[in-house]
């Protein structure tokens, strides 16, 4: 039996200027008229539903983008807004291997770690002119030539760096030691403890360390500033000076450096600075600029 559609006369439509309190649904509710349109398969006989199920529905149109007309290989891929800091081309990297002493230039995630270069000058024959990596304790290069002049010996490992922080270390005795880097070489094993000190109000800070012959170790800590009788603040006999240097810093033209001092033959050496005549150690944080030595 077919359903009967409601007659138009049975539906009350309010006039244009008349507020109606009744709705058409109340008038036609006795006819069991569906209020919502039923789904398509409700009106399809069972014999035809199987045939309709074999029909593949149309694919909805894809959202148009500015790159819709470009080939797939030319469409720019989505990337994060935060980009990695580009690694300096002259950054010297050492693989985290205890046996490898050869600098590696492989570009992997480990190489993105900021490096610390250390050059050491000492009267000890096994520690003369060594340049090591603080993160691994491996030797980057070694200067073997003898230096007779004590003035040159104090600054033999000075080098140019791009990083704005540079550390100059001079020996100072303390008793504590903390294992940070061990066994720099087999003849004179040492243990390192490195700590950085940054104070926004100071342009330089002092840090001290000491190698002991009984327990060969190097420890870094912050020393105490003191005044002499003439009112001048002096450094301890050995210390680390953290200099705040701009990216455009020109070490060769620095008035604080002694430009008359000859340049050494070390691979990472540059113009000598006017440092005290003590055993010295320079720690360069960041990538090293190619040497200007001749």
From Swiss-Prot:
GO cellular component term of the entry, any: nucleus
Protein name: Uncharacterized protein PB1A10.05
Compartments, record wording: Nucleus
Keyword check for Nucleus: yes
Biased composition (Polar residues): 7-26, 66-81, 255-277
Major localization class: nucleus
Key word Secreted present: no
Domain of life, per lineage: Eukaryota
Region feature Disordered, mapped onto this chain: 1-30, 51-86, 250-294
Keywords: Nucleus
